[in-house]
Amino acid sequence: MMITIDANWLASHLDCPDIVIIDARGIIPYRFRHIQNAKPLGLEGVILVADNGANLVIDPPTAEKLFSSLGIDESKKVVVYGESIDPSAGRIVWTLMYHGHPDVKLLDISFSQWQKAGFPVVREEIQAQRQKEKAEAPIGNGVGPPPRFKSKVNPTIRADADYIKTKQVDPNVVIIDARTPQEHFQARIPGSILDNWEEGIGQNGEMIKSITELEKDFEEKGITRDKEIICYCHVGIRASHKYLQLKQAGYDRVKVYDGSIIDWAQRRNLIR
């Protein structure tokens, strides 16, 4: 399953009305420069902060309101971009997948690399004028009713603590800690293995390594396609990017524990 989409393809489809481009970098960098027709979506928009501090996926009503406001429905292809050193774009892609969007992709290179390659970028004031012109276009020019996103939750790509407890000693399950070695050895879910999310990004602005490189890395760690994979990190952000890396490499049974260590720590089952 190809998670990424080619930058050259996007550059040639920037004005396509059936594509929604999402900038995951935050509003300040967005205002400075962004890809033409992109819309900003901060990480906080796709997170529900639980009482214990866990960063959980937003519920269906929230997702429907949010994604509809961005012009997303099931007929639109969604392309999310960000920076390779920031896993936020991965969490947004995973959130859309969890809520059942059928066609969401991660831009294959970072925004910095997009600029470096000479692809077009715009400033906020130019983009605002473009949006104004579109809003003033007559109905007969293709402007119809506003998009309506309908959540169709896919529970197979999400795990919670109770589910993990039933899988900790299952030889057919691999639990991946996508954090740093320091974090892993300080406190981790018993039985989990370390696979830092940064090991799955490229060295030249690629959001995800080549499939060949991913396969080699995963197999060396015993992360094989015949296993069910559960990813976690601190608050489920880096784990979401690791999920995309696994899907890109052709792994079918992959889940994200979005509660991650913040949620697990409340259950007093950590190895320290």
Language-model-derived ranges and their functions:
Residues 48-77, 198-229:
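Helix-loop module immediately N-terminal to the HCX5R catalytic loop
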Residues 256-272:
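Cysteine-dependent PTP/DSP-like catalytic domain, specifically the C-terminal lobe
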